Each structure stands twice: as structure tokens, then as C-alpha cells.
């Protein structure tokens, strides 16, 4: 992932302003350590921090059309760029970058070209011929993007909050699937509006081979790279399928010819964690070069402040899962790898979270999947993008391919419903699609392994250790004042309070706290789905183990009232609050 920053229509074209833009752009350099670029045209500035994945030799940004009247700074990957180039025969391209097509598409089609892009992207385009501009973000928000407004009437755009939060009167997350155009009076326009967006119940019959074909296509197109890459492999269904398909199709690709035909896979976890065991087994089955990274609870706790600074959230489940991903990304980048494929998005599309066992009917099931996909940019996309980008590593997510989402979301949700009495566990339609007896994609027990959320799979003591640490830093008196100190999204647990304190230190603006979602949740549900089971109101925790009666290692946080237990041995040196009685909601 690259880092982009744009300041448009400001009242200052001085050298001091240019220096300030460069200073702010450097805050995004972790996203793109390979090269920096800046373009200034009067009161407009476009800056870029590049992570070179395609055409590393000549693809530096900003990018231009032939006469340099149209300028683009972009963070993204356009998978169909070669096909798009064929339709632009009268245009001359300056680079081999996949993003070079954007300026030329605009020149040919105006602002109506965005839906032609198959990929992930955030970009700012400046048309110097009339001093107009447009900003756009990909369909579901795989790339991160923020928009803000300065006191002088300027418009700011940045890949991360840290690039604009000090200089804007107000800022917010740029909505996925939208564009913002100065030509339309400075308003947002939704360019991505698929049939499933209205949440009406679809009726397409389930065809396993259609799902298989659509997902294989989504993975294959993401093998486009000019740099070393690998796959994140936790041993769960989603990452294992991504790894299996990649291993099958890697031979013969340009990447294989340049870097070798053997796939590299990566896994992280506490010693003895479920993911480490399963990931190793899948790697051996697929024949990948497997890299296992171990961390301790203390390692994770030590990284929390860095994680919150980079991921820019105080959401509990996002921080829990981002921390091991953050640690793993640093290790991966140290090996010279610049891109990884990852399995985010499947649980939202297929209802894979364990709370979906309680969906009362297919309409509720489908509407919850729609809500989850629409909110992905606030949670898993945010994590996958920023936890990896902290070290100049790009994460690609084939489950969030536009065509695959449309195929999967057109299914009659009755086929996705979880029915244990019929042998249908969560994500049954996906598992069945890849259950091939003649040429197996995965071992059966991996193909039908129960869902583990990433923050659980890396080791159950990870979350338990976080809670114990938070309890050492947040006392009951602080919690009693939580609603006064934090009236918006008031933290309900000591762990949430602890993360909020750190977040507010980095991002104290009201606009910043409003970018983070809130509301009731159990096992990563939306607030609406909490209504499915009355008992959940007493056990509000985003961990999958909160799904009592569903998860094999479920716990009931509402029924445990004990002295605070000793934390994991990795944090034994932290003083304990002796004798305090608390309700443990693990």
C-alpha cells in the first residue's frame, strides 16, 4: 500500500506550505518507503509515498496524462489494467504502472470511469485545465482514506488520519464506493451500488462450482506482482483456501518465473496456539515454504501503543487482532517480502462468525451479512490495510473481489444458513464448493475446521492477558467516570478504556473519535444481531468464544466473579491489584 496526501484549494502557495505538506506526507512514509513525490499547481498539492509492487523502476508518482494536464496520486492495485490499456489505443503511457490508466480513463470518459476499475484503490485526480478535482475510494474500502476541510476552505485527503488531523477543522472517513467531485459542487456520489446493497433477499440457487470458479478467478488476478510475495496462513478455512488456490496457479505466472514456483506462507501465534498447529499442517500439505512467528503476551502488550497509532482505532476487537498481524508484518517485511494475500471478508459474506448460528431466518441472516460487508472498512479492512502498511507491506484480499462478492451475495441465503442437524456448519456453501474428492484442495478436517477469530486463533491467553493488563492500568474509579470522560462511545470495559486513553493521546480531536464505530456486539456481531439471543446482553465481548453453546471453547463472562487471576507468565512483572474482586469477561 502506498500513502497519498492532497491539499486542494488552499489559500497558501508559499514555500512554507509546501514544506508543511511534505512534513505531513512523511508521516505516511511507512506505507510507501520506496520513493516520495510531490506535485504543486498553484494552491493545490498532491504528495505520494510509494510502495513499488508493479513496475518498480518507472512507476513513481504522481502520474500524468500525455501533456501532464491531468495529475493523479493513487494508492492501489488495478488488476485489469492491461485490458483497460487495450481500450486506450490513442493514449501514450509514461510508465508500466497499473495505476497509469487512471488519468487516461478520465481523459476518455470523464468521472464515470471508476466502475471500470477492477481492484483496490484510493486516488485524487487534479484536472489543471479547469482546476477541478475528484477523489474516489474502492468498492468496500480495502484501502484506507480520510477527507477533511481546513479553515481556509481547503479540502484535504489522506490515506491515514495522521496526515491531516492537526490541520483540519473537521475530518471523517471517506465512504467506500463513493467519489467526491468539485464539478458537482463538492458532494459525494455513490459509484458502487450492486443489487445486494438494498438488502432484499436474493433467490439464486446454490451452485458449488460457480462459487469455486468465482473465487479462483479472484485469487488468480491478485497474483499480479513484480516483487516477492506470500500468503498469510493461519490454518483456518479462509486463509487455507487462498493458499491452496495460489499454490495451484503460481506456476507459469510472471511472479513464479522471477521469484520461483514455491509459495511462501506465514503464520503468527503464541507458543502452542491453534493457528500455529493448523497453519503448519496446511503448509506441509500444500508444500509451501512456511515461516512461523512466535510472540508472547508481553510482546503484544509492548506493541499496543504502536498498533493504535498505526491502525487509528480504539475498537477492541480490531486492536486485539491487529497486534499479532502488526508483529507478523514486521517479520515478513524483514524477509524482503512486499505483498501478501490474506483471507479477510469471507465471514461477512458467508455468515461465518459463530453468532450466525442464532440467525432466526434467512432474511435476518442475509441482512446481517449486508450490514457486515458495508462496515468492513471500519474493522477488518482497516486492520488488514494499516497493520501491514505500518511496515510497507501490502495485503490483498481476494474474498473482497467485486465480482466474487456479487456472485456470493446473489445466493438464496437459505443455502448459507447454519443447520447442524443437517451437517451444515458455518460457511458450509464455501466449504462444499471446495470439497473435491478427486483433487482435494485441503485435508477434510481443515476444510471443516470451526471458525476461529484471528485474535482467538493466535492463542486464547492473548485476550486473557490483555484484559489482565488493562485491569492493572484502569481502576474502578476511572470506570465510574467513564461516561463523563468519554461521552461518545463510552468504554464499557477496562480493556476498552485502556485503548481509548491511548487513542485520545494520539488523536484528541472530536472528528477522530467519531471515525471509530461503537454499539453493542457479541462475537463480532452488529448491534442489530445482538437481539437474536437474549442471553447475549450479559456477555458483550467481541471474541468468538463469547458465542456460548457454539464455540468449542466457549466461556460465559457473565457468570465468573473471582479475584483477578494471575496473568500469563509473560507479564508476571506487572504489579497486580491485590484482593480486587472483578467480573471477568474473557
From Swiss-Prot:
Record flagged with keyword Amino-acid biosynthesis: yes
InterPro entries: Asn_synth_AEB, Asn_synthase, Asn_Synthetase, AsnB_N, GATase_2_dom, Ntn_hydrolases_N, Rossmann-like_a/b/a_fold
Metabolic or biological pathway, per its Swiss-Prot or TrEMBL entry: Amino-acid biosynthesis; L-asparagine biosynthesis; L-asparagine from L-aspartate (L-Gln route): step 1/1
Active-site residues (renumbered): 2
GO molecular function: asparagine synthase (glutamine-hydrolyzing) activity; ATP binding
EC top class named in words: ligase
Family stated for the protein in its record: Belongs to the asparagine synthetase family.
Record site feature (Important for beta-aspartyl-AMP intermediate formation), residues: 344
SUPFAM superfamilies assigned to the protein according to its UniProt record, in alphabetical order: Adenine nucleotide alpha hydrolases-like (SSF52402), N-terminal nucleophile aminohydrolases (Ntn hydrolases) (SSF56235)
Domain of life: Eukaryota
Gene Ontology BP terms: L-asparagine biosynthetic process
Residues in Asparagine synthetase domain copies: 194-517
Catalytic activities: L-aspartate + L-glutamine + ATP + H2O = L-asparagine + L-glutamate + AMP + diphosphate + H(+)
Keyword list, A-Z: Amino-acid biosynthesis, Asparagine biosynthesis, ATP-binding, Glutamine amidotransferase, Ligase, Nucleotide-binding
Name assigned to this protein: Asparagine synthetase [glutamine-hydrolyzing]
Domain Glutamine amidotransferase type-2 residues, every copy: 2-185
Residues annotated for L-glutamine binding in this entry: 50-54, 75-77, 98
Residues that, per the record, bind ATP: 232, 268, 342-343
A Pfam family per the record: GATase_7
EC number in record: 6.3.5.4
GO CC term, one of those recorded: cytosol
